């Protein structure tokens, strides 16, 4: 079930969020994106590819950012169900770790792993973009939620390193396994 929060103070117009995960003092805001990716080769139709990336990566990042702004902008941020019943009340002072995650259903690992570095796409630094398939790998790999949260901390920080352009999400995992704080 999606989450909803008001635009302004009225419940007449609501923004939507896919998933909010709470674990201890950590908050993970997730947007899940799917869509038809252009079948045209990038070499012949670059603009079509750029629009596909914008639709999958940039919009998800913007939705995550908008959700965080709402949560941080209200002392008691209320999240509603679609029928406008209160689902949860958030007090952001309870969270010391906040991660934004855009999950794509489409298999775009080569681009998702470095989405924040694609020219022409505006993704909030710190936002982790990955495929649902990579999440399944993480589910099998990480034995402890605390190790996974430490990985998210490092993975989020990696988005801010301009020189780091890995070609696959599992390259990020490999860097973490072999170098820990990469």
Predicted regions mapped to residue ranges:
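Intrinsically disordered, low-complexity Ser/Thr/Pro/Gly-rich regulatory segments
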Residues: 1-182
């Amino acid at each position: 079930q999606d989450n909803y929060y008001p635009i302004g103070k009225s419940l007449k117009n609501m923004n939507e969020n896919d998933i909010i995960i709470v674990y201890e003092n950590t908050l993970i805001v997730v947007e899940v994106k799917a869509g038809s990716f252009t079948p045209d080769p990038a070499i012949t139709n670059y603009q079509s590819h750029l629009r596909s990336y914008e639709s999958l990566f940039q919009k998800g990042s913007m939705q995550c950012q908008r959700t965080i702004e709402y949560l941080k902008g209200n002392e008691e941020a209320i999240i509603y169900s679609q029928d406008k019943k209160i689902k949860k009340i958030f007090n952001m002072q309870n969270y010391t770790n906040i991660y934004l995650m855009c999950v794509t259903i489409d298999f775009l690992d080569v681009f998702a792993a470095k989405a924040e570095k694609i020219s022409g796409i505006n993704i909030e630094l710190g936002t982790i973009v990955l495929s649902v398939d990579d999440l399944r790998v993480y589910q099998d790999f990480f034995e402890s939620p605390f190790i996974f949260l430490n990985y998210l901390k490092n993975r989020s920080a990696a988005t801010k390193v301009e020189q780091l352009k890995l070609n696959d999400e599992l390259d990020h995992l490999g860097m973490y396994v072999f170098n820990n704080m990469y």
